[in-house]
Amino acid sequence: MSNSSCWNERYRGAPAIIEPSKLLVKFSGLFPAHGRALDIACGGGRNSVYLAGRGLRVVGIDRSWEALQQGRELARRQGRNVAWVQGDLEAVTLPIDAFDVITCFYYRHPTLYPSLRAALRSGGLLFFETFTRDQLNFSSGPRNPAHLLEPRELLQAFGDWDVLFYRETWVERGMAALVARKPKLRV
C-alpha cells in the first residue's frame, strides 16, 4: 500500500489510535522545553498531538488526508495545535536545520535518511521505530520486504550520532527502534 487512495481507505472508518508511542513516552524526558518537531508518516496524529502537548511546535506529515483528518480531530479534542501537511514522503523536500525533534514510526524509505539528517538541528533528537525483515516470520503486519528494515539498518544510517537507545527484537513482531541525538557542531 503506497498510494494515497489505499492509505485513505485504510484510515476511513477505522478507529483512531490516540495513545502515543511507548518509545516517545519512555524518552519524553529528553525533549527540549520548546522547539519544533516533525512527525514523518504521522498517520492519525497520535504522536504529533503528544509532542504538541509537551510544548513543541509540531508539523505532522502524511500522504493520507483521511489520516490527517483523524489527527485534526484528535488535536481539536485535546486542545493542541499541530500543522498538518499532506504530502508524498518519497518526494518531500525538508527544510535544513529546521527541527529539534523528528519522529518516524512505521515507515521506511531509505532515500529519506539524508533529508532527515539534514532537517534535524545539531543536538536534536531522532525517534525511529518500524518493522524489520523478521516481521516476515509472523502472520500479521507488512509483507512487502521493501517496507521492512534490513538488520542494523538504522544503526548504519544514524550510528555516527549519539545513539541513546537501540533495539531490534523479534518477540511477537520484528521491530527496530532507535533514539539518537545529532551531534552538536564543534566550533
Residue ranges and their predicted role:
Residues 64-66:
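Conserved SAM/SAH-binding beta-strand->alpha-helix loop
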Residues 94-101:
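A short acidic, Gly/Pro-enriched loop at the edge of an enzyme's catalytic core
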Residues 1-32, 34-43:
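Conserved class I S-adenosyl-L-methionine
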Residues 71-72:
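Conserved SAM-binding loop
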Residues 124-131:
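Conserved beta-strand signature within the Rossmann-like core of class I S-adenosyl-L-methionine
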Residues 78-89:
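Conserved SAM-binding strand-loop segment of SAM-dependent methyltransferases
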Residues 108-120:
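A short, conserved alpha-helix within the catalytic core of class I
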